[in-house]
Each structure stands twice: as C-alpha cells, then as structure tokens.
Amino acid sequence: MKTKEIPIFLDYSQSAPERELCTDCGISRTTDPKRCGTACQFIHPQYESLEQKIHGKTRTDQGEDALFFGSFRQMYRAKLKNPLPGAQWSGITTSLGEKLLETNQVDAILTMAPDALDPWKPTPILITQSTDMVKARGMRMGYAPLLALLDVAKEKGYKRLGIIGIPCQVYALRALEKELSLEQLF
C-alpha cells in the first residue's frame, strides 16, 4: 500500500524566461531549461517522428479525422452516466486519472487544479492518491507550467506518470519521455 502523500502544488509566481511563442509548459522552469530546444513543438517540431513512435503511424496515414484531430490509436466520445459534482464534462477525465492511481498503473498524475484565489487560474499539481483527483475537477483551459513538476516527480522516483494537459504540454513530455527514463506515460 502506498503511503498517503498530499498533492504537490507548484508555486509559479516567478515568471518564466521570456521567449517568443512560449506557452510556458514548464520545461523552461526545470533544472535543465535548455531542453526547450528539443522538446518544444514551436522550436523543434517533430510531429511525424513522435506520431510514428507513439501511435505506429502518422496523421497523414490516417485520413481526414487525423488531419484535424492529430494522430490517434482509436477515438471515442464518452461521458459518465452520472456526472460528478464540479466536473466540466461529467468528470470522465478525472475518473480515468482516479482509476489509473487506484489500479497502480501510474505513480502520479500531472494535472491542473484551481488556484486558491482565482478558480479560473490553472495551477499545476502532482497527485498520487486517487481520492485527491477531486481537486482537479473542472476544466481550466489556460497556460500554466505543468511540466515544471517533472523535477519533483523525478526526485520522488515516479517512473509511471499520467498527464491531463493541453497539447503543447503533452507534446513536450512525449518528446522528453525517453530522456526522463519513464517506464509508462498515459
């Protein structure tokens, strides 16, 4: 049984280094900010090679849907039969995160929670207990340095991570996945 850990929130009151096109995914705030040069989809786009590596095919191999949505293995539309309180789209995404933690498929989930003073401001959080996923309910579609928590995850020895984030965060994490020695990434 895992020991009870409280979620780790990121204090990002310090501004990130100024860069054109930067969405502040958080890589520039890590111990090795130079990784932006290889991880950022704006600085070093490598869509086809990452799609091939992750999905076994590229978006150009998949037809019109993939050209619009990006490469995918399978595509589903789903919602919970009984929506959860405080959830945006029924709570299915946070429920998937809960299940990954409950079944020990991941050590932690990187996601966003509301800021204590501004509920619309996304605050990066690293969650290790399924019961804490409730803190991440509700969609906060804004830029925040989620990946700055990768240093904390590494310090804690987390090798299996789930991520609930926006495309530029997921892209950067996938680009660094091998370098980070992750065993599993959901």
Where are these regions (language model features)?
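Iron-sulfur cluster-binding cysteine motifs and their immediate structural context
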Residues: M1-T58
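Iron-sulfur-associated redox domains of electron-transfer enzymes in respiratory
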Residues: E48-F186
